[in-house]
Amino acid sequence: MNQVSDEAKRNVALSLNKYGILKFGEFKLKSGIMSPFYIDMRIVQSFPEAFHNIANIYAELLKDLPQDVLLAGIPEAGIPLATAVGYVTNRPLIQPRAKVKDHGVGKLIEGEWKPGDKVAIIDDLVAKGDSKIEAIERFKECELEVVGFFLLLDREMGGKQIVEQAGYTLEAAMTITEALTILKEENKLSADQYREMIAFTRENQ
């Protein structure tokens, strides 16, 4: 796995907190589990500083990826992320449609590509991993080879292992534990808050 710098991790963690992308409270996850925190990556593009820091950490994560590998974001949160990462890394981008049009050319995946091309999937985070497995099917239908997933955050809920058991690599720039630890060190979280978040993470691994 490519290592990203401590400075990049710190910049991202502080941005997630500063702009309310990482929220604290009581939230119901897709799995039905109640969580004391939630990461709302769908608002990232509204905050240029956060968007910049996040695009840069993806660039570090992808630095050893061959230049001919296409990037693709998973709708919806992954699309603006992949677009920003493609721009800062000068990489070609394709985009799976959330819903196939019934007019025009009716493409499953927008952009220039051909069967046999390799694709790196960009997404925001992984929790249980089921949505990642589902996403692969669209690319397989188009005979594109998925080389792996590249994400900002691993929520450490077993999703990484599920994806890897399916035969795909998954690299995250940082874990939720790393992000929470940075916020505690920067006095953005109290000791009690930190203990609660870490306990939840450990209980749901």
Describe the role of every protein-language-model region.
Residues M1-I122, V126, D130-Q205:
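PRPP-associated nucleotide enzymes
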